Amino acid sequence: MPDVAFATSGSTGPPVTWLRTEAQLQSEAALVREAVLGPARFGRVVSYAPPEHLYGRLYSRELPRVEGVPVTGLWDRPLALPPLDDGVPTLLVCLPATWQLLARHLPALARHGRVTALHSTGPTTPAAHRVTSHLAGTGFRAFELLGSTETGAVAHRPVAAGQHDALPWTLLPDVEVPHDVEPPPGAATDGDPADGHGAARRLRITSPRLARREGAEAPPDDWELPDLVTPVGPRTFHHLGRASRLIKVNGLRCDLARVEELARARCPGVDLVCAPVGDPVRGEHYEMFYVGPRPADPADLRRMLGRLPSGLPAPRAVHRVARIPRSATGKVLTAELTAARHPAEEPEHV
């Protein structure tokens, strides 16, 4: 059978096509079924992930085929509630935005008691942790996958309430980290090595499921993901964030995901994102983009933000835009966003 093509999201550059064999797809679905989801049986899969992307194809097509169960595809109806009235053991294939929907239907999920959620394509959201916290003890389970179009799933961990970031990731059984990989020059972070932040490195792995780039004769021997990690054990690690989300502003380390989390808490109802940009004085910086009728003036949004805690630098500029471009799986198309930006709409905050 011909290989199956999947394109990267184009979130940081032009999309690239990667090819996978049917055997690789079937192997990954079976592996995640056994190593992550465990022995529990499912009577139905409800998927919010579009099958033209790898994550959606694996768990909207391949896994149901392995299980021999029907699929309810809701990727074109992201606000549709999954069927929960019949008590059928259900696997929910979630995108980051799905958890807001689930958070509005906690009583139905609690009554059902036989729902498992699978999460990927982006970090878990505050809504995901609210859902798992509220449903603790009801039989609801949730798991998170880390991976990419190039590698497939690499590692997994439960989605938990509370100190979620403290939970280490575990490599999938067929994934290895080359022992000769050392942190590249400048990869170490500013933290104390004792707290797990002293030996950060990009995650490089080998796996029989690595995809083949279109035009290449074979898959690469290994692949380096844009994720910064610190080892915990031989097959576990802490995830510090994506390298593209961790910047240094005049020597001060800044996690853009953390800035977004704080900004959304202070500006409820505002759709906003941060994008890294080059800076002629500081080397690199970031700018904030938001959508919505309010506040009408970007300077008002900066005032709503106030002073960011923990020494996080304020955005270099704030832009109000007509829309935030996203891929079908919800990833922000950063290159498209920053290419269309206008000159700073309010004075730089130093």
Name each model feature, range by range:
Residues 1-7, 40-43:
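Conserved pre-ATP/AMP-binding loop-to-beta segment of ANL
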Residues 34-71:
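Conserved AMP-binding loop of ANL adenylate-forming enzymes
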Residues 321-342, 350:
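Flexible lysine-rich "adenylation lid" loop at the C-terminal edge of ANL adenylation domains
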